[in-house]
Curated annotation (Swiss-Prot):
Name the UniProt record assigns to this protein: Translation initiation factor IF-2
Task of the protein: One of the essential components for the initiation of protein synthesis. Protects formylmethionyl-tRNA from spontaneous hydrolysis and promotes its binding to the 30S ribosomal subunits. Also involved in the hydrolysis of GTP during the formation of the 70S ribosomal complex.
Similarity remark: Belongs to the TRAFAC class translation factor GTPase superfamily. Classic translation factor GTPase family. IF-2 subfamily.
Residues that hold GTP according to the record: 441-448, 487-491, 541-544
Region described as Disordered: 50-195, 260-346
Encoding gene per record: infB
């Protein structure tokens, strides 16, 4: 069987869905909402419960015999009274509900009533057919019962089922009759419907008629007054007419003034529609006798009335009239002139550079025009939106008699201010702090051995277990005093820290082997220490060896500016043996003595500041940074800004790997809790709260990103004159590397003699040998050139120079170096060509051919070697020969070039001293486009 939803039933019956849902629940059906579906028979049952509302005039007489029949069946079947009562229950609460509804006047839905009547007739026919069918089945059952004879129990069940169906049908018919009777009562009691549209139309017609009558009366009155005035004017003289017109004008003005003063009383019913009124200033002409006259005249009058009604309309009475000569505003009293309030000038004025005239006027409560006038009298042409410098603002305040003070703006993201501010430290709270010592020197001179000896034999007393975690720095105790050693051996880390402005080292221990003497890296370490302005303690190591000569070491160091105190210098010399732990105590005592002379002090009461020694990313801990506290005390949970990152100190460990909660001045600790790993050499500072630390860290990261995007403008020979002219450079720093010591001395002396406009050349470092990575690092830190005289940079140094944007100039004639430097400083440098290295090759084998010369078998290791390129022969980093190729072959074929990874043979024009492992550098001269 098909199903129906409750809202479909409601639509068919013309009822609301909620009424149908309520009725279904009253009938005992399990429904939840209007979208619930029921069987077709149940739907018919629900529709039948609403049928009396759709059939107002149905006789209820046939219900009487069925009720009696129902009673008879109840009497004849005493075993079924409960079932009949249950079937009749749903109809009992319906009657009172329909009586309540009948009291309300409702509009009838004739379509729904017709559909309901049609369905009722169809159901009635269906029920009649069902009754006939039941009677036939009953007769068949009786025949079967007669045939079967012995099946008495089955016939009883069939009889009961038949009686139940009859009772059910009788109950339904009874309920239908009751609903029909109630609907008849409702239709008789229903009040007559009110047609609101008809009432509105009648009211409108009445208003239009009233409006037409009033308009006609006004027009007749106007015409009568006009005719009377015309008759009176005919009898009067012209002078009297003029006098009367003047009197009428005066009366009209008086009436208008009264109307303006006395507000009009609003009538209760105002018709805001456009009214057709006769114009008082023109005579109306009747053109009714003409065919087209009235229609045209009516059109013109309506257009004129539209304009007049727009002017006289009362739609927006509150809108101000823009015209000053309006009649309504003519007799109003003028507004009083507002007097300007006098504001006293402030006694003090706090200003910042770049304040505009309008801002100053607002602060001192004066008009901008007044300040512009004063500035004009002072000889300064300015507008109210123009910025003024500090001097002009101070002069302006003097003219007003106000004391001007410049506002000092504090940059919260600037960590460096904590290191330079005098008021940050409390002079009364300063205490002595341990010195920070860095050990430097040549790799093979026992520097690592000295570090191991100090670490293993001088660990802080009371600490058991030794060093369990290497964090880049450690402390030892000597004579009850602590000494902090930075585990940053070598000059590279020291220079990179100095390049970032982190001079955390107080003392440098320079380790020199007594048997080797001064080596190139020793000289570089001396230059780094002098550049950082750090005192040097020389430790002459390996004095236990047979070939040790300490006196020779002292003499060699004196040549490089490191003088012993015995010779009248300021550097302490100690002879030690790190391997046999000889004179180590004397070295530590010397360190404490130098530290005492320096008077190293710190304030442990302020918030901690310091420097990053090293940083890394740990898989389990995240960003881990080793910090050296320089001032103040660092605590766990302190909000901290480190370089361009920020965070909170989550955990803190000392050099022994043990957890600590407090770290004082000159104490190295490893911390976790940063959101990113900082750079070595960055400064750190503790802030008041996490909010300010976060703001400072984010601002520093933003500035670093902007700085990184901007191209770094380093000094070069091309922009040297502009830099000097702008006053940005007072001296030119140069690093000299040459093939022999004589060339180094000659070139240094020649460059130092150049003096242009008070600018001198400063030789930062000079040495013999190829240009290495240390030279590039030093040049990057010192913002210097590198001048190579008959030497070449190593591949690693060349890559680092390109990365750090350090300029390397290579020359073979000394006077060209001097001329180029002079022309650069005088602004006359105009290079036309630039050298470009196109490839490198290594000689694998040599072949000497009589009457031809030496042929070099080579392999290209980088770039290419071209036939028309120039070549240099480099042996051990020193240029041996510079010339051109005589021939270039690949096997037996002459070729124009040999590319990377291929082999070939070459001959150099005018040079036959080619040896194995010589480097052939191929280069071309390219024109520089300016």
């Amino acid at each position: 069987m098909s199903k129906k939803r409750l809202y479909e039933i409601a639509k068919e019956l013309g009822k609301e869905s909620k009424e149908v849902v309520a009725r279904a629940k009253e009938l005992g059906l399990d429904v939840k909402s209007h979208s619930s579906s029921v069987e077709e028979a149940v739907a018919a049952k629900i529709a039948a419960s609403f049928k009396p509302a759709a059939a107002p005039k149905v006789e209820a007489k046939p219900a009487a015999p069925k009720v009696s029949a129902e009673k008879k069946t109840e009497k004849s079947e005493p075993a079924k009274p409960a079932v009949a009562k249950e079937e009749a229950k749903p109809a009992e609460p319906v009657a009172p509900k329909t009586e309540k509804v009948a009291a309300k006047p409702q509009s009838r839905n004739f379509k729904a009533e017709r559909e309901a009547r049609a369905k009722e007739q169809a159901e009635r026919r269906k029920q009649n057919k069902g009754n006939n069918r039941d009677q036939q089945q009953n007769g068949n059952r009786q025949k079967n019962d007669g045939r079967n004879g012995g099946k008495q129990g089955q016939s009883n069940r069939d009889n009961r089922r038949f009686n139940d169906q009859a009772k059910k049908q009788q109950g339904q018919q009874k309920r239908r009759n009751e609903r029909r009777q109630q609907e008849d009562k409702r239709s008789n009691q229903a009040a007559p419907r009110i047609d609101f549209k008809a009432r509105a139309a009648a009211l409108k017609a009445e208003q239009n008629a009233e409006y037409a009558r009033s308009s006609e009366e006004r027009f007749k009155q106007y015409q009568a007054a006009k005719e009377a005035l015309a008759q009176a004017n005919k009898r009067k003289e012209p002078e009297e007419i003029f006098e009367e017109a003047a009197k009428l004008a005066e009366q009209a003005q008086q009436v208008q003034a009264v109307v303006e003063v006395v507000p009009e009383k609003k009538e209760p019913a105002v018709d805001t529609r456009r009214k057709k009124q006769a114009r008082p200033d023109k005579n109306r002409d009747d053109y009714d006798h003409e065919e087209d006259g009235p229609r045209k005249q009516q059109k013109n009058r309506s257009s004129q009335n539209q304009v007049r009604n727009q002017k006289n309309s009362n739609w927006n009475n509150n809108k101000k009239n823009k015209k000053g000569n309006n009649k309504n505003n003519r007799n109003q009293t003028p507004k009083p002139v507002t007097e300007r309030k006098f504001h006293e000038l402030p006694t003090e004025f706090e200003y910042t550079d770049g304040m505009t005239v309008a801002e100053i006027a607002k602060r001192i409560k004066r008009e901008p025009a007044e300040i512009v006038k004063k500035l004009f009298m002072m000889g300064v042409m300015a507008t109210q939106n123009q910025s003024l410098d500090g001097e002009t603002i101070e002069l302006l305040m003097v003219d007003y008699g106000i004391e001007a003070k410049q506002k000092v703006e504090v940059d919260n993201a600037d960590i460096e201010r904590f290191f330079v501010e005098d008021g940050y430290l409390n002079e009364d709270e300063l205490v002595e702090r341990p010195p920070v010592v860095t050990i430097m020197g040549h790799v093979d001179h026992g520097k690592t051995t000295l570090l191991d000896t100090l670490r293993n034999s001088r660990v802080a007393t009371g600490e058991a277990g030794g060093i369990t975690q290497h964090i880049g720095a450690y402390q030892i105790v000597e004579n009850g005093k602590k000494i902090t050693f930075l585990d940053t051996p070598g000059h590279a880390a020291f220079t990179s820290m100095r390049a970032r402005g982190a001079s955390v080292t107080d003392i440098t221990i320079l380790v020199v082997a007594a048997d080797d003497g001064v080596m190139p890296q020793t000289i570089e370490a001396i230059n780094h220490s002098k550049a950082a302005n750090v005192p040097i303690i020389v430790a002459i190591n390996k004095i236990d060896k047979p070939g040790a000569n300490p006196e020779r070491v002292i003499g060699e160091l004196a040549e490089h500016g490191v003088m012993s105190t015995a010779w009248g210098g300021d550097s302490e010399f100690v002879e030690i043996s790190a391997k046999f732990n000889q004179n180590i105590e004397e070295l530590l005592e010397t360190v404490l003595l130098v530290a005492e002379i320096q008077e190293l002090k710190a304030d442990p009461t302020v918030r901690a500041i310091g420097t990053v020694i090293e940083a890394r990313l740990d898989k389990g801990k995240g960003a881990v940074a080793t910090l050296l506290v320089q001032q103040g005390t660092l605590n766990v949970q302190d909000p901290i800004v480190v370089g361009n990152t920020f965070g909170r100190v989550r955990a803190m460990t000392n050099d022994l790997g043990r957890r600590v909660k407090v770290a004082g001045p000159s104490t190295p600790v490893s911390i976790t809790g940063l959101n990113e790993a900082p750079m070595a050499g960055d400064h750190f500072a503790v802030y008041e709260d996490e909010k300010s630390a976060r703001a400072a860290g984010e601002e520093r990261a933003k500035r670093a990103l902007m700085k990184q995007r901007q191209a770094t403008q380093r000094v070069s020979l091309e922009n040297l004159f502009d830099t000097l002219k702008a006053g940005e450079l007072k001296s030119v720093n140069v690093i000299i590397k040459a093939d022999v010591q004589g060339s180094v001395e000659a070139l240094s002396a020649s460059l130092q003699k150049i003096d242009v406009e008070g600018v001198k050349v400063t030789i930062v470092h000079s040495a013999v040998g190829a240009i290495n990575e240390s030279d590039v690092t030093l040049a990057e830190a010192s913002n210097a050139f590198i001048v190579g005289f008959n030497v070449r940079p190593t591949p690693q140094a060349r890559q680092q120079a390109e990365a750090d944007d350090v300029e390397i100039r290579l020359h073979s004639i000394i006077y060209k170096v001097i001329e180029e430097m002079e022309e650069a400083m005088k602004g006359m440098l105009d290079p036309e060509f630039e050298e470009k290295v196109i490839g490198e090759a290594v000689i694998r084998e040599t072949f000497k051919v009589s009457k031809v010369g030496t042929i070099g078998g080579f392999m290209v290791i980088n770039g290419k070697v071209a036939r028309d390129s120039k070549v240099r022969v480099i042996r051990d980093g020193v240029v041996i020969y510079d010339g051109e190729l005589a021939s270039l072959k690949h096997y037996k074929d002459d070729v124009k070039e040999v590319t990377n990874g291929r082999e070939g043979g070459l001959m150099i024009d005018g040079y036959n001293d080619i040896k194995m492992d010589d480097v052939i550098e191929a280069y071309v001269m390219e024109e520089i486009k300016r």
